[in-house]
């Protein structure tokens, strides 16, 4: 699948596996590849992103093992450091905590999920504990994207 943001001159190309999960995500800006990730899953839970060129882990997610389905992420390991998530009752990530419980990033949202972050830790899981495709301004819900600007899905629900 290919997404194009003409105003930002950004192209995102994704491949999917036989279960419909996103397998790779390559982002190019002005024709130069800026990010090329390969994803790992536990069932349908995205648990890690690996740099497809170097093979290095970009991040690793720890989900609540007591939940049968994806509920909320508990922590993320990024750049060799663990960070803990704080969320509200609708599963939106609202805070990222660093070592010793220090608040590192705070997230606020519009009613449909446009995000504003204040802090120094960037990470992909945000609105509704789903993946934020920052380059496109869309929220990835495993099978389709939500446009948080107007609260609409960009495609039909796959059957």
Stretches with model-predicted labels:
Residues 1-5, 11-15, 21-26, 44-52, ...:
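Beta-strand elements of repeat-based all-beta scaffolds
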Residues 75-143, 148-150, 154:
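A motif-centric feature for acidic-aromatic and gly/ser/thr-rich catalytic loops and repeats
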Residues 6-9, 30-34, 53-56, 66-70, ...:
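Short, solvent-exposed loop/turn segments that connect beta-strands within catalytic domains
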Residues 4, 16, 29, 50, ...:
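Intrinsic-disorder/low-complexity regions
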Residues 12-21, 36-45, 58-71, 83-91, ...:
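Aromatic-rich beta-strand edge motifs centered on tyrosine
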Residues 27-31, 150:
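A periodicity- and composition-biased signal for non-globular, repetitive helical segments
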